[in-house]
Structures are given as C-alpha cells and as structure tokens.
C-alpha cells in the first residue's frame, strides 16, 4: 500500500517578501535576462518560477517527523530552507554553482535521491522549464504558439547541446582558455552577427548616408523622423499637411530641440530649433484623437476624412528631422534633399504581402488603408529586413564551413538532435534570426521617437498594432538605438547567461 504523499514546503509557508522583491527587481534587469532574447507576452518572473519549483519539490519539515520530531526543530529547519530560497531567488546568484548544488541536494532528499522531471505543457516564454533546468531537473516544455516554441528551444534545448563548446569563428577560440556554459555559442552569435551587419552595409549602405551638420562635420544617422501627410480639405488651400502628435525631438534639460514648420510657396518647410521655448498645449502637434488641423490656415481635418484619404492611398510622408550621433550624445538636424532622395527606393519583390487581421480594436492601421503586413514598413525598411534575413542563411553556410575547418564532424541537422557542425550552424543561425526579428520591432513605420529618453520606441509597447502619425525610422546599420547590432547584443547576452 502506498503511503500518503508528504506535505511540501509550498503548502506550509514561503518567504513571500523575498520572492516578491526579487520578482519586482527583475523588471529593471535588462542585459542578460532571458526575457531579452525575444519579446513574448506575459512572461513569468524567473524568481517566482524558481521559488515555486523548489518549494513544490521539497518536503515541509513537519512531514519528516523522524528527522524533525519537535515543532521547534521543524521551525528551525523551515527557517533554513527559507534562507536558502531567499538566496536562490536573487538574480545575482542565478549562476552560483555551489548554491544550486545545495538546492539540488534538498530536492534529492525529498525525492528518494532523484531529481524529478518537470513538464510545462503551455510554457509560453519558458520561465518554468528554464528554472527547472537551472535547478538540475529534466525539463520538458510545449506550446501551441510557434514563437513560444522557438523561444523555448533557444533558451532550454539548444544551449545544453553545446555546453562549454569553444566558438568556431576563426581566431575567437584562442581568446581564452576555458569557455563555460553557452559562452562559446554567444561569442559566435556576436561574431557572425557582426559579419551580417558588415555585409549588409556593403550591400545597402548607400541607402543610409551620413548627415552633414551645420558646422560641416559628418555624423552617422540614428533615425529619420517622418510625419504622415494628408491633403487639406480646404479647396482654397489644399496644402499637404503633416500629421504630428508632437513637434518636440528632445525635452531633456539643456538639450531641448523641436521642429518648426512653416509654409513657403505652398509647401511646408521644416527646421530644427534648439531651444527650450518650444510649442506647448494645442500647438505641440497637429493631430489628436478627434482629427487634425491644417498647417497655415488651421482648417479642421476630421479623422473620418483622414481615414478616407488613407483608404484611397492618398496619405504621404514628409521628412521633418534627422537624429544623428554627436560627440556628446544625440544631435538633431534639419532635413535635406539628400536624405529625402535616399528614402525613395523600390519595394523589394520578396516581402510578406499577407492581409492584416480584420480586428479594428487591436489593429488600427487598416482603418487608414494600411491593410497588408508590408504596408507597416517603408520600402527602405523592407529592403533592410529582407537583406538581413537573407544574410542569416548565408551566415549559416559560413558557420558550417568554419566548424568543419575546426575539426567538428558535420553530423545531422539540429532538428535531428545532433551536436555536430551542421547542428551547430543551425543553432547559431537561430539566434541570428532572433536578432533580426528583434530588429523588426524597431524597424517599422509604427515606431516612434521617445523625446524624453532620446531613443527609439518599439512597435509592441503594448499588445496591439497602433496607428502612428510621426514615426521614427531607425538606421539598422548604426550601432545605436534600434540598430541590428544593438538587438544582436541583447540576444548574445541572454545566451551567455542561460543555464547549459
């Protein structure tokens, strides 16, 4: 006859304050956190997942009276386990081998000397199976969402296959004597990612010219600030009007900058002004929730009219400012013809042309004629993203060749569960593709410029596709906010820290 199951620690008490504090603090930890590998909704805090798994698998002292016969002895042991949990949930201790060995021993004591397997059938962003793996448990995960499956494979399945493997990029393995966890994998992600960026610049760099400041110095562009435009409904003055939420480029104290728009010869001219004395209130922009106002004469433009013009494919865009890398931070420069002309490129042939869902609550752009996936990007962005995507496949071939040259047998592909050169090339290419996908979140015409933080704001700030009037087009070939190299570094740092 089987004995009754023992009461677990989670059924009695938990150090909730420590768990809550660690979970809240996780939100401010960015570089190296697994959540930065790729965006996914409603990720569970790692500290909570780790604590709950441990407390579910470890017996409460009261269920082991042969070891802890008195209430006092049980309280003392419970306090010891709580102290261990308080150390376990701290982010700084995530890769403390000695601490996690102690945790594994406690789990073994409560499970007949074994480390049990853990299954999360709806793993989502992978917090539970990832922390199960960190605790030394056999982790199994599944999900209905293919993105979740890919993220979970990249966090949980791939790194252990190449545990402590040195990188294969020529000359990199010799940089240190020992490669721990997935550090070698992360090093190759960086090196082949930089190759992708450099090759992309060679192919499409002419589409991203440097900008000349008023003093004559050249600077790398971080972002181009655009405003969508609509023809004024006033027949006496049918000017092409910019639709702008805010003319402000920077509200940072001492670095204030904004755009002044003026009508000259029936056209709008834009000038960057460096002054704290900028537009306020109703003058801060030209469009709001109820519609817009025409530049010059102030003609009211209803939201319905803007939507009609959008569905008739009559919305345009004006370049209103350029953000560039300066010697002491961001600099803001007035637009010019060189950068307007660089924007005018042909739509590439191999872009996703599917229709957006008909869901006006969460997908706002079809109301304005942007009903296909490709409509959410400028042509230049589509050229950049298709180029980067194509280069991931080319990078895989380079990785395979370099791995073979390093003496690794070719073996089967990663999907077959192998760990040879072919599987390794697949693994690195997976992370490179995730970096391109992250770049997409910062490379659409639905991104905006954060004028207090002086940085790009991504599309998925919330779980919806909004309509954005004045949008920021990041330079994917720069090394600044919204660039491919920036997204690559987020991925590489996440890979470095995952348990392998």
Question: Model segments located where?
Answer:
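Conserved glycine-centered beta->alpha loop in an early N-terminal alpha/beta scaffold
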Residues: 122
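Conserved SAM/SAH-binding loop
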Residues: 125
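Nucleic-acid modification enzymes, centered on SAM-dependent nucleic-acid methyltransferases
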Residues: 2-119, 129, 133-500
């Amino acid at each position: 006859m089987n004995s009754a199951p023992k009461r677990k620690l989670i059924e009695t008490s938990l150090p909730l304050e420590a768990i809550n504090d660690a979970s809240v603090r996780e939100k401010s930890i960015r570089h190296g956190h697994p959540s930065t590998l790729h965006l996914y909704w409603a990720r569970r805090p790692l500290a909570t997942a780790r604590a709950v798994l441990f407390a579910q698998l470890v017996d409460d002292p009261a269920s082991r009276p042969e070891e802890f016969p008195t209430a006092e002895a049980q309280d003392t042991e419970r306090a010891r386990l709580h102290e261990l949990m308080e150390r376990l949930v701290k982010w700084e201790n995530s890769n403390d081998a000695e601490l996690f060995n102690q945790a594994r021993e406690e789990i073994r004591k409560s499970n007949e000397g074994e480390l049990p397997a853990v299954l999360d059938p709806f793993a989502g962003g992978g917090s539970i199976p990832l922390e199960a793996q960190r605790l030394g448990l056999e982790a199994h995960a599944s999900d209905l969402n293919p993105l979740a499956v890919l993220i979970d494979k990249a966090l949980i399945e791939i790194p252990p296959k190449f545990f402590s493997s040195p990188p294969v990029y020529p000359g990199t393995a010799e940089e240190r004597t020992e490669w721990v966890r997935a550090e070698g994998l992360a090093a190759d992600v960086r090196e082949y990612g930089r190759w992708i960026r450099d090759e992309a610049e060679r192919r499409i760099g002419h589409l991203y010219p440097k900008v000349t400041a008023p003093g004559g110095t050249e600077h790398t562009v971080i972002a181009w600030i655009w405003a969508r435009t609509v023809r004024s409904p006033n027949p006496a003055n049918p000017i092409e009007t910019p639709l702008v939420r805010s003319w402000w480029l920077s509200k940072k104290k001492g670095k204030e900058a904004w755009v002044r728009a003026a009508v000259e010869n029936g056209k709008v001219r834009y000038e960057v002004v460096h002054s704290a004395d900028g537009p306020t209130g109703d003058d801060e922009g030209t469009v709001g929730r109820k519609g817009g106002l025409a530049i010059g004469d102030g003609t009211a433009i209803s939201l319905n009219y803007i939507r009609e013009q959008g569905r008739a494919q009559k919305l345009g865009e004006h370049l209103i400012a350029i953000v560039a890398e300066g010697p002491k931070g961001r600099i803001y420069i007035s637009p010019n013809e060189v950068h307007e002309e660089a924007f005018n490129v042909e739509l590439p042939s191999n872009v996703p042309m599917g229709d957006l869902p008909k869901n006006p609550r969460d997908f706002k752009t079809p109301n304005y004629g942007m009903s296909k996936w490709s409509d959410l990007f400028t042509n230049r962005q589509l050229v950049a993203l298709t180029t980067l995507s194509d280069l991931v496949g080319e990078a895989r071939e380079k990785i395979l060749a370099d791995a073979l040259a390093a003496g690794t047998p070719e073996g089967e592909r990663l999907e077959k569960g192998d760990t040879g050169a072919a599987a390794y090339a697949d693994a690195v290419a997976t992370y490179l593709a995730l970096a391109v996908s992250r770049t997409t979140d910062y490379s659409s015409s639905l991104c905006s410029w954060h004028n207090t933080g002086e940085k790009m704001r991504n599309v998925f700030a919330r779980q919806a596709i909004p309509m954005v009037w004045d949008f920021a087009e990041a330079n994917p070939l720069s090394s600044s906010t919204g660039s491919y190299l920036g997204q690559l570094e987020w991925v590489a740092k996440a890979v470095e820290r995952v348990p392998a």
